[in-house]
């Protein structure tokens, strides 16, 4: 009964929000006569002067998300860049562990330089077969990922029964 009341309250809230979202566009923007435009706020349509002011840019023609961070990175020496991932972060780079390179995702121990293969993500023990991701105990059947004591093909188990 409580779930039914919660669903009814949420539906009523969605209905109220959708009704209140219908606003009239000013005459300045009335040149767009499509049926979907009254559902968008007038702030969604900017003049060209407003658009230029709204986008911060320090270099012409390009938009940098974190210009201060990029300037600091470019000013650093090669020695300082080696430990760059320890103190600072860059947008769009996902780092695990101490050091990270853009486009490289590392978990656990560092791979040996002799056997490091680009595009291979390793977890736990090293697998003999390329393209096989191994967790926990070794499986005798291909395509079976085993967790715990018993496992069935196609069943992934975590924790207790």
Curated annotation (Swiss-Prot):
Subcellular location: Secreted
Residues that make up the propeptide removed upon maturation: 22-80, 111-113
Modified residues annotated as Phenylalanine amide in this record: 96, 107, 123, 135, 147, 158
GO cellular component, one term: extracellular region
Signal peptide start and end residues: 1-21
Biological processes annotated in GO: neuropeptide signaling pathway
Keywords, comma-separated and alphabetical: Amidation, Cleavage on pair of basic residues, Neuropeptide, Repeat, Secreted, Signal
Recorded family membership: Belongs to the FARP (FMRFamide related peptide) family.
Entry protein name: FMRFamide-like neuropeptides
């Amino acid at each position: 009964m409580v779930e039914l009341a919660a669903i009814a309250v949420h539906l009523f809230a969605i209905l109220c929000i959708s009704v209140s979202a219908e606003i009239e566009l000013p005459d300045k923007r009335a040149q767009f006569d499509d049926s979907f435009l009254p559902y968008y706020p007038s702030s969604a349509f900017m003049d060209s002067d407003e658009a230029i002011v709204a986008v911060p840019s320090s270099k012409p023609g390009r938009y940098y998300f974190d210009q201060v961070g990029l300037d600091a990175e470019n000013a650093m020496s090669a020695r300082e860049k080696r430990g760059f991932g320890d103190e600072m972060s860059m947008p769009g780079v996902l780092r695990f562990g101490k050091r990270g390179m853009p486009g490289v995702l590392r978990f656990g121990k560092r791979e040996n330089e002799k056997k490091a293969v680009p595009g291979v993500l390793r977890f736990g023990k090293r697998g003999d077969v390329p393209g096989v991701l191994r967790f926990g105990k070794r499986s005798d059947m291909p395509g079976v990922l085993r967790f715990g004591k018993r496992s069935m093909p196609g069943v992934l188990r975590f924790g207790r029964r």
